[in-house]
From Swiss-Prot:
Homodimer. Belongs to the pyridoxine kinase family. PdxY subfamily. Gene3D superfamilies: 3.40.1190.20. Pyridoxal kinase involved in the salvage pathway of pyridoxal 5'-phosphate (PLP). Catalyzes the phosphorylation of pyridoxal to PLP. It comes from Salmonella paratyphi A (strain ATCC 9150 / SARB42). This is Pyridoxal kinase PdxY. One of its GO terms (cellular component) is cytosol.
Length: 286
């Protein structure tokens, strides 16, 4: 069973960051060690919340505690997501180095959350710059959405070919694998939700139906997507197998959420279909 140190946000009510990804990852058979960068009452797209950003030293101290009991060598991957500050990011890279010193086979999966002010997702100053300058070259796998891909590659991405090229430019700087979590306007069809999974040698495209939630889209979809992909890859799935399972599993969560007329992702209700999706979507090699 794989062990994943997941360093990202936590909400007490609802699902975002670790609160979205932790349970689905466990449902696929991974041990998740959740380490929270922030603890908020709820996710920020409600427009108001309470809570705090964890001091960067808190992250390092917790991981040192795990090292002190001799367990860090059993960590197979570090996953990072929403950061409360750029300084937290610097400490996370120190943690990645510490984990890799204990287990040289461990991977670093970076979900470079950079914020979408128009959607109510706010990140602290310097976080985007941290991802571009430091997290990108340190990562083994990175999972930007379209906007984040453009920021990381420093140019516009207007179609699928552009996205593959931009992903390969990122690979040249460090990562082995790039997941483009949402192609949006750069995809083949505005009627579908599309993703890319790219390495230096391969590029896989997949699409599924959009699920219409109106103006109030659920939060945490990207967090679940990143977490599930990491689990599948650690378990030995091929790029194609991992992409197909994750796409179907996330779709099952979206369908359950829509059916129950909820705003928060219904990961518990969809748990059996996360492990064994009823839908299937085929990935195409480009």
């Amino acid at each position: 069973m794989k062990n994943i140190l997941a360093i990202q946000s936590h909400v007490v009510f609802g699902h975002a960051g670790n609160s979205a990804a932790e349970f689905p990852m466990r449902r696929l058979g991974a041990n998740v060690w959740p380490l929270n960068t922030v603890q908020f009452s709820n996710h920020t797209q409600y427009g108001k919340w309470t809570g705090c950003v964890m001091p960067p030293s808190h992250l390092t101290e917790i991981v040192q505690g795990i090292a002190d009991i001799g367990q860090l060598a059993h960590c197979d991957a570090v996953l990072s997501g929403y950061l409360g500050s750029a300084e937290q990011g610097e400490h996370i890279l120190g943690i990645v180095r510490q984990v890799k010193a204990a287990n040289p086979q461990a991977k670093y999966f970076c979900d470079p959350v950079m914020g979408h002010p128009e959607k109510g997702c706010i990140v602290a100053p310097g976080v985007a710059e941290f991802h571009v300058r430091y997290a990108l070259p340190a990562s083994d796998i990175i999972a930007p959405n379209l906007i984040e891909l453009e920021i990381l590659s420093k140019h516009s991405v207007n179609n699928v070919n552009d996205a593959v090229q931009a992903a390969r430019e990122l690979i040249a700087q460090g990562p082995e694998i790039v997941l483009v979590k949402h192609l949006a306007r750069a995809g083949y069809s505005s009627e579908r939700f599309e993703m890319l999974l790219v390495t230096a040698q391969e590029a896989w495209h997949i699409s599924r139906p959009l699920v219409d939630f109106g103006s109030r889209q659920p939060v945490g979809v990207g967090d679940v997507t990143s977490g599930l992909l990491l689990v599948k890859l650690l378990q030995g799935a091929t790029l194609q197998q991992a992409l197909e399972h994750v796409t179907a599993a996330v779709y099952e969560i979206m369908i359950a959420t829509k059916t129950m007329q909820e705003y928060e992702l219904q990961v518990v209700a969809a748990q059996d279909r996360i492990a064994n999706p009823e839908h299937y979507f085929s990935a195409t090699r480009l």
